[in-house]
Amino acid sequence: QRQCQNVQNCYKYCMSPKKCEYGTCYCEPSP
């Protein structure tokens, strides 16, 4: 579960986070 409060929290899960929504990180597809 990729939890976040804002998109900055997503950098620990994603190289290029797309958004934080409903407490979950969404990542851009990796190259």
Swiss-Prot record:
Query: Where is the PTM Proline amide found along the chain?
Result: 31
Q: What does this protein do?
A: Blocker of potassium channels (Kv).
What is the protein's name according to its record?
A: Toxin BmKK12
Under the cellular component aspect of Gene Ontology, which terms does the record hold? extracellular region
Q: Which residues carry this modification: Pyrrolidone carboxylic acid?
A: 1
Q: Domain of life of the organism in this record?
A: Eukaryota
Q: How is it modified after translation?
A: The N-terminus is blocked.
Which GO terms fall under molecular function for this chain's record? Answer: potassium channel regulator activity; toxin activity
Keywords carried by this UniProt record: Amidation, Disulfide bond, Ion channel impairing toxin, Potassium channel impairing toxin, Pyrrolidone carboxylic acid, Secreted, Toxin, Voltage-gated potassium channel impairing toxin
Query: Which family does the record claim for this protein?
Result: Belongs to the short scorpion toxin superfamily. Potassium channel inhibitor family. Alpha-KTx 17 subfamily.
Q: In which tissues is it expressed?
A: Expressed by the venom gland.
Quote the entry's note on domains. Answer: Has the structural arrangement of an alpha-helix connected to a beta-sheet by disulfide bonds (CSalpha/beta).
Subcellular location, record wording: Secreted
Q: What are the disulphide bonds in this sequence?
A: 4-20, 10-25, 14-27
